[in-house]
Amino acid sequence: MDDEVAALVVDNGSGMCKAGFAEDDAPRAVFPSIVGRPRHQGVMVGMVQKDSYVGDEAQSKRGILTLKYPIEHGIVTNWDDMEKIWHHTFYNELRVAPEEHPVLLTEAPLNPKANREKMTQIMFETFNTRAMYVNIQAVLSLYASGRTTGLVMDSGDGVSHTVPIYEGYALPHAIFRLDLAGRDLTDYLMKILTERGYSFTTTAEREIVRDIKEKLCYVGLDFESEMGTASSSSVLEKSYELPDGQVITIGNERFRCPEAMFQPSFLGMESAGIHETTYNSIMKCDVDIRKDLYANTVLSGGTTMYPGIADRMQKEISALAPPTMKIKIIAPPERKYSVWIGGSILASLSTFQQMWISKQEYDESGPSIVHRKCF
């Protein structure tokens, strides 16, 4: 590896793609992982009409497009669209030639093996990268927080997971994955806004609801008492202006929506909430290291950005854990991008340079090399 060439770090989330150069302290490009296709026939002669739009451009033209997310629950479901997103990342956002750089990609834990094999194949065969590596998202978040031991509760748009890490080793038997994350909350908010008489149905309108969610939702410390406050006064009501100037008011939806993270039964799911999952993850670990995990529980990902979520986690886990246990929930302010930041740190370490999968190794072994070289 030449020292002059910076590695590219691409954190392909289900909702947002974060990309940039190793050693930077923040991603240069952050755009929605969306591919949009026109839903109408073009009639203007001479206008350049594309058959697909990616990222922010798709978002800005969403009124005439059908929007699709190629990554669902952390797993790539449409590889052609995924290639478009990577192409857009390299050539339009970062403006680099991928064949000149090593590329670090991220993925959710407990993903199907074929997912990372295909990622590897596309990087080497379509984009001709010099070298690449795939890392687990939660592990990178822990790097970013400057720890080597801790439990990461990472929740993005497509998938949430709890990953206990001890002295830099992830403990695979204690990793829990929850297919309940930001996108499910957006859908749930669409549903409960319908009860108020506001109808949001199209893929474009879903993006409006996502914006409402990001701007106005919060996690209540005590759900029942928040509900009481909401029904007896209008102190919790907030208004939101839609793109057409119409103003809508939302009240208890503000905390009912993220409450589903703690009570998945709201979404008709039978799984445990994020607090129980975190606790179960710790309990699956060796009794000697639990204390360190309780004291170093790190939140990461966009769905942990709700105000009040850290206090609520503290309260819920304290109720489950032994009474004398010291519990500390760490919510770094940059946690929206901590996976990317961790990747940037990792890819710039001198000790990491022998870890890359080189083009030569790929040519000798094929895509399955990724399971041997990457944890």
Swiss-Prot record:
GO molecular-function terms, A-Z: ATP binding; hydrolase activity
Main localisation: cytoplasm
Species annotation: Styela plicata
Pfam name, any one: Actin
The protein's role, per its UniProt record: Actins are highly conserved proteins that are involved in various types of cell motility and are ubiquitously expressed in all eukaryotic cells.
CC per GO annotation: cytoplasm; cytoskeleton
SUBUNIT field: Polymerization of globular actin (G-actin) leads to a structural filament (F-actin) in the form of a two-stranded helix. Each actin can bind to 4 others.
PANTHER family tied to this protein: ACTIN
Assigned keywords, A-Z: ATP-binding, Cytoplasm, Cytoskeleton, Hydrolase, Nucleotide-binding
Localisation: Cytoplasm, Cytoskeleton
Name by which UniProt lists this protein: Actin, cytoplasmic
EC number: 3.6.4.-
Domain of life: Eukaryota
UniProt-listed InterPro entries: Actin, Actin/actin-like_CS, Actin_CS, ATPase_NBD
Catalytic reactions on record: ATP + H2O = ADP + phosphate + H(+)
Family assignment from sequence similarity: Belongs to the actin family.
